[in-house]
């Protein structure tokens, strides 16, 4: 079974986002993965906005050698492709209008993705306002959609579905003060057919449980682990 099929069939799963930019040494990364192996985290997502190609390959290869969890590449740019991942999210930032992230990065990476043989999953990437100036907004030079603009969020998600994207990733941004709202999730789940990934600003167990109850397929957590390593120990099991 492909990783996409797993994501489509499962709900309430937990993903750990690892940004190699924030991992200062291999020993720190090793400790993180070893702890993750003993936790109920289901997937590892790896990617960052400033990682050099060689470093990225090395990180993916190292994590693959010690991880018991599937590795999903969450690329920050066209250079972040590696055969050592289990799947790659082929992202299109459809919430913005910067052509570099609508088509240019995809064109640059296409041959490398094919040559790697990695499972490639077309993914709508929709940036929502998490009430912070996120690194995604800075790097992509795009403006997040306000979370009160539900009709625009829905129309954007449906456009991605019509473009043939298999996954929808709603992103409030790393360290967001406000995560993707439950109202937004409920609307998207009721009106779209794509498997749903939600990330950004998720720091409370209650938020995770509420998202699980609404049928989010994959809940991505990053900053909460960075700020509180014991977060591994209190993660809730799927409802």
What are these regions (language model features)?
Residues 80-161:
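Conserved anion-binding
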Residues 1-23, 109-122, 129:
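N-terminal amphipathic alpha-helix/helix-capping segment at the start of soluble metabolic enzymes
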């Amino acid at each position: 079974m492909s990783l996409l099929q797993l994501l489509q069939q499962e709900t309430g799963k937990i993903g750990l986002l690892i940004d190699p930019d924030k991992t200062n040494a291999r020993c720190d990364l090793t400790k993180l993965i070893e702890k993750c192996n003993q936790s109920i985290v289901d997937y590892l997502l790896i990617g960052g906005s400033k990682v050099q190609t060689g470093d990225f390959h090395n990180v993916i290869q190292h994590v693959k050698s010690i991880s018991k969890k599937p590795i999903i590449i969450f690329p920050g740019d066209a250079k972040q492709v590696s055969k050592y991942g289990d799947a790659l999210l082929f992202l299109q930032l459809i919430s913005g209008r910067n052509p570099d992230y609508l088509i240019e990065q995809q064109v640059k990476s296409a041959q490398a993705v094919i040559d790697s043989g990695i499972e490639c999953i077309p993914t709508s990437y929709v940036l929502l306002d998490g009430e912070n100036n996120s690194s995604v907004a800075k790097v992509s030079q795009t403006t997040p959609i306000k979370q009160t603009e539900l009709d625009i969020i829905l129309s954007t998600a449906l456009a991605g579905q019509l473009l043939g994207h298999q996954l929808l990733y709603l992103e409030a941004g790393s360290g967001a003060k406000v995560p993707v709202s439950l109202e937004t999730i409920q609307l998207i789940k009721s009106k779209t057919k794509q498997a749903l990934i939600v990330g950004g600003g998720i720091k409370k167990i209650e938020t995770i449980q509420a998202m699980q109850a609404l049928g989010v397929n994959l809940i991505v957590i990053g900053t909460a682990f960075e700020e509180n390593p014991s977060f591994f120990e209190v993660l809730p099991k799927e409802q």
